[in-house]
Swiss-Prot record:
InterPro entries: Membr_insert_effic_factor_YidD. This is Putative membrane protein insertion efficiency factor. Could be involved in insertion of integral membrane proteins into the membrane. The lineage of its organism: Bacteria, Pseudomonadati, Pseudomonadota, Alphaproteobacteria, Rickettsiales. It is a peripheral membrane protein. Its main location: membrane. Belongs to the UPF0161 family. It comes from Rickettsia bellii (strain RML369-C).
Length: 73
């Protein structure tokens, strides 16, 4: 599952994101880099949950800033 999600993420980063204007993320690391790190660190299920929470925060009413992937326990 993680490999499929990483493949979809790579497709998004190289083919869809440039069509949307490139880097528009309010956070560091960017949402796509965060997603890749979350999937590699936490696997598919928890990684998807972390990605979902991050994307919900990536909107005009949020200040953004530094928001790293949480460490594993």
């Amino acid at each position: 599952m993680t490999r499929i999600l990483l493949l979809l993420l790579t497709f998004y980063r190289y083919f869809i994101s440039p069509l949307l204007g490139g880097n528009n993320c309010r956070f560091y690391p960017t949402c796509s880099k965060y997603a890749k790190e979350a999937l590699n660190t936490h696997g598919g299920i928890k990684g998807l949950w972390l990605i979902f929470k991050r994307i919900i925060k990536c909107q005009p009413l949020c200040d953004g800033g530094y928001d790293p992937v949480p460490l594993t326990k």
